[in-house]
Regions:
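Aromatic-Pro/Gly-enriched surface loop or interdomain linker
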Residues: 524-606, 637-639, 659, 663-664, ...
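Proline-anchored loop/turn motifs at beta-strand termini and strand-loop-strand connectors
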Residues: 342-375, 388, 461, 465-491, ...
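A glycine-rich, often tryptophan-bearing local segment used as a flexible ligand/cofactor-contacting loop or short
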Residues: 608-693
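Active-site rim/loop-helix segments in enzyme catalytic domains that contact anionic ligands
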Residues: 1-89, 110, 117-121, 125
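Low-complexity, acidic Ser/Thr/Pro/Gly-rich terminal tails and inter-domain linkers that flank the onset
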Residues: 291-330, 420-444
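Catalytic beta-strand/loop cores that center a nucleophilic Ser/Cys/Thr
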Residues: 659-754
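Short glycine/proline/serine/threonine-rich loop/turn segments at secondary-structure transition edges
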Residues: 387-403, 505-513
Length: 769
């Protein structure tokens, strides 16, 4: 129907899992933001995100069962103000939350439903966030609020299975094409052509409504003729009504001209002239301010739509191309703006304007205006861009730093096409620093054990460069060497330097930070630039402090402990086991199928391993035989769809469904140790209540609902006010060995260096000893 549509998203998915790479946390949020942006292009939807910056309060803190928990963690007033602001900016006629507030739904989705329903009326109340008026945002009352429904109880049925001959797909298929962009979440399905419907129920309305409606806009002024009838009785209403009726005829003419592109362009530009004239009439008319604001907004939206339609109909291809997207403060670079005319209509008075941030300088290197551009011709304007010496480092959630406006005249009216570079243009640190390891354990039982740190440095300055690399360490600690000079022959060259950090002999338990520093004259870098590059989202960056977090606590690790680790690709616990002194071998398919498993004291299966290591299914009998002969097998959480079957365990274990009901999301929830004398809680590390403190995001995921009586139930734990689970941590003797199944979220806690989680995991892999 050509309705101007917006998708407002709360957070950026930082707390999820990554199905295409190793990025987690903020880096994953950056990927998912770019995926949202690309998905929005597919469906021609304008994207808005309430989370505004890295580590914003509206953060994906992981799975939540309730809207109350979500709003408490986000700050209800923070998220509500931003949603009300969006509604007042966009002034929608119809509002639809994507999810219902029901127990089977993620708490983040439920929270947005709750505040969206509330905002339907509050956005129109001038006493709600009155400060918006100071920024030119007037209260706004949407006409209707719908919520998702089903075929048993609905108001509107949307035929998403209808085939669109222009797009060559059904709307359901187009939607899935958009969902396929969310590759980090594994989204997207293939649907055949054929009837399909989405259902929605009218929840609130300010206009007369019926039990069944033909579409969302029944009873709402939908066409320019509808608007003309609404304003006809107002002061200067007859003049306005004539202008609006003219626009209705224009719109009909545009549609009738399709697919004759040149004719479409002519009608678009006729309508553009009429829209711009109507805007002037609205400003001069004796209207009440609410009506003036409404008409102005609608006409501005139409003007923007016509700009897009003009470029499409004229086959205008506009691009902005920096010689490099990787800049540093003080650098000068060339940026080119091009306009190609692929249509038969000559473009006149073509202007290529480069837009840069305040404080930047963009100097034309030649012509930027061209009298006429004919069919199959390209014009180019080159600019010398100077980045100020105090330019802030790249922030991935801000609008693009460089854009271009291509303006041109056709059929007597001027249109503007705004373009952005295909990849991010980023101000990066002159020297990007990364530390390996990125997090480290300091065992206070061995305080003088040195920590080896490798600093990798990438030169982002144009040309050759030199820098002295050093580490800032806590007071009383030492580092060798104190500094190391590096010389780079060209931009993009990467070199590494090794340091040895020695903690103070009196180091106490706690968190310490080591920072990498690159100094080159007056320039100093203390940041790293993580390059994030995938085919479906292009290139972007995560700039963050170049820091190594060190967690100091006491940890006993048996000598000579040998562990085989079967990775699913979704966790990196093996790296941290190595770091604390465990001899870890990553097991290949061949190792699992035919290798000597008896050489390992313990074999650990990473999260969801049965779903992503098919050899585990065919070799499961070998694993159980390994246990029976005296081995120690540790299995981390699985979902039913990970090929999990109860009989994979030596005694049956059934995973609870629906999955949403079988997890503990409060990382601070009380844990009771049901078998406090079990070796897992005593050997080699004594586990106390303190070891359950400072966990992050969750306690457990996808807990078992049934298990054999042979298992020892190690803990009881549940979210506040809910039943406790006793199948979260199960262990059993099998033959001469031990089998342990745990749905505690070790994969989150151990990389976060949670002391209790690391101490318990070491105990778990030490059971044979």
């Amino acid at each position: 129907k050509g309705v101007d549509t917006y998708s407002i998203i709360a957070n950026r998915g930082e707390g999820g899992q990554n199905e295409i790479g190793s990025e987690l946390g903020n880096a994953l949020g950056i990927i998912r933001t770019r995926e949202l942006q690309e998905a929005s292009k597919v469906t021609n939807v304008t994207l808005g995100i309430l989370s505004e910056s890295i580590n914003d309060p509206i953060y994906d803190f992981g799975f939540s069962k309730s809207p109350d928990e979500t709003l408490a963690k986000w700050g209800e007033q923070v998220v509500y103000e931003r949603l009300i602001r969006k509604i007042r900016e966009l002034r929608p006629d119809v509002v639809i939350p994507a999810f219902l507030n029901e127990p089977s739904t993620h708490g983040h989705h439920r929270a947005i439903n709750v505040i969206t329903v509330k905002a339907f009326k509050d956005a129109a109340d001038p006493s709600v966030f009155p400060e918006h008026l100071q920024h030119g945002l007037r209260p706004w009352q949407a006409k209707k609020l719908y919520v998702p429904a089903d075929e048993k109880d609905y108001t509107v049925r949307v035929p998403v299975g209808e085939y669109d001959e222009v797009y060559g797909a059904s709307y359901l298929q187009l939607g899935e094409e958009s969902r396929f962009m969310h590759k980090s979440q594994g989204m997207g399905r293939h649907y055949d052509e054929g009837p399909s419907f989405n259902y929605y129920k009218l929840e609130q309305s300010t206009v007369p409504s019926k039990a069944r409606e033909s579409d969302f806009f029944e009873g709402i002024a939908y066409t320019y003729d509808d608007l003309a009838r609404e304003v006809a009785g107002k002061p200067d209403g007859e003049t306005l009504a004539r202008e609006l009726s003219t626009l209705q005829k224009d719109a009909d003419d545009v549609i009738a001209a399709y697919p004759r592109f040149a004719d479409v362009a002519r009608e678009v530009h006729d309508m553009l002239s009429d829209v711009q004239r109507a805007l002037t009439v609205v400003q001069e008319a004796k209207l009440d301010e609410a009506t003036r604001a409404d008409l102005t907004h609608r006409l501005k939206v139409k003007e923007r739509q016509l700009y897009t339609a003009s470029a499409e109909a004229l086959s205008l291809v506009a691009k902005v191309r920096p010689e490099t997207g990787e800049l540093v403060a003080g650098q000068t670079a060339t940026v080119k703006v091009t306009a190609y005319n692929g249509g038969q209509v000559p473009l006149k008075d073509v202007s290529l304007k480069l837009n840069v941030p305040e404080g930047w300088r963009a100097k034309p290197l030649g012509a930027t205006s061209f009298g006429q551009v004919g069919y199959n011709q390209t014009v180019t304007a080159a600019y010398e861009v100077e980045v100020p010496k105090d330019a802030p480092l790249f922030q991935p959630y801000l609008p693009p730093s460089i854009t271009a406006d291509v303006s041109y005249k056709a059929f007597g009216s001027t249109a503007v096409s705004r373009v952005v570079p295909s990849d991010a243009v980023a101000v990066l640190p002159p020297f990007s620093l990364s530390l390996d390891p990125g997090a480290a354990v300091l065992n206070t039982l061995k305080p003088q054990e040195p920590i080896s740190v490798k600093v990798t440095v990438k030169n982002y300055q144009p040309g050759a460069a030199e820098a002295d690399i050093s580490l800032d360490v806590p007071a009383g600690w030492t580092v060798e060497p104190k500094a190391s000079p590096l010389a780079f022959a060209a931009k993009g060259e990467t070199k590494s330097v090794a340091f040895t950090v020695k903690p103070s002999a009196a180091v106490k338990s706690g968190t310490y930070t080591v920072t990498a520093v690159a100094r080159a004259g007056a320039k100093e870098s203390r940041h790293g630039a993580q390059v994030i590059r995938y085919p479906h989202i292009g290139t972007t960056y995560y700039v963050q402090p170049a820091e190594l977090m060190i967690q100091a606590f006491d940890l006993k690790v048996p000598e000579g402990l040998k562990v085989g680790y079967v990775s699913s690709g979704f966790d990196n616990i093996d790296e941290y086991l190595k770091q604390v002194g465990v001899n870890v071998t990553l097991l290949s398919a061949k190792d699992i199928e035919s290798g000597d498993l008896s050489q390992y004291d313990t074999i650990v299966l990473g999260i969801r391993a049965y779903g992503f290591r098919p050899e585990l299914i065919s070799s499961n009998a070998r694993l159980l035989k390994y246990v029976e002969n005296g081995g120690n097998l540790v299995v981390q959480y699985h979902k039913p769809e990970d090929n999990w079957k109860p009989e994979l365990a030596p005694y049956p274990i059934t995973i609870g469904t629906p999955l949403i009901e079988w997890r503990v999301t409060d990382e601070n929830s009380k844990v009771t140790m049901l078998a406090p004398d079990h070796p897992i809680f005593n050997t080699p590390n004594k586990i106390t209540e303190e070891d359950w403190n400072n966990w992050i995001q969750d306690r457990s995921a996808y807990n078992p609902s049934q298990w054999g009586k042979e298992y020892v139930e190690l803990i009881a734990n549940g979210d506040p006010g809910e039943k406790e689970f006793t199948g979260t941590f199960l262990t059993a003797k099998y033959g001469k060995g031990t089998y342990t199944y745990s749905s505690l979220v070790w994969y989150r806690e151990i990389p976060a260096l949670v002391p209790g989680a690391i101490r318990m995991f070491v105990n778990m892999v030490s059971l044979k000893q």
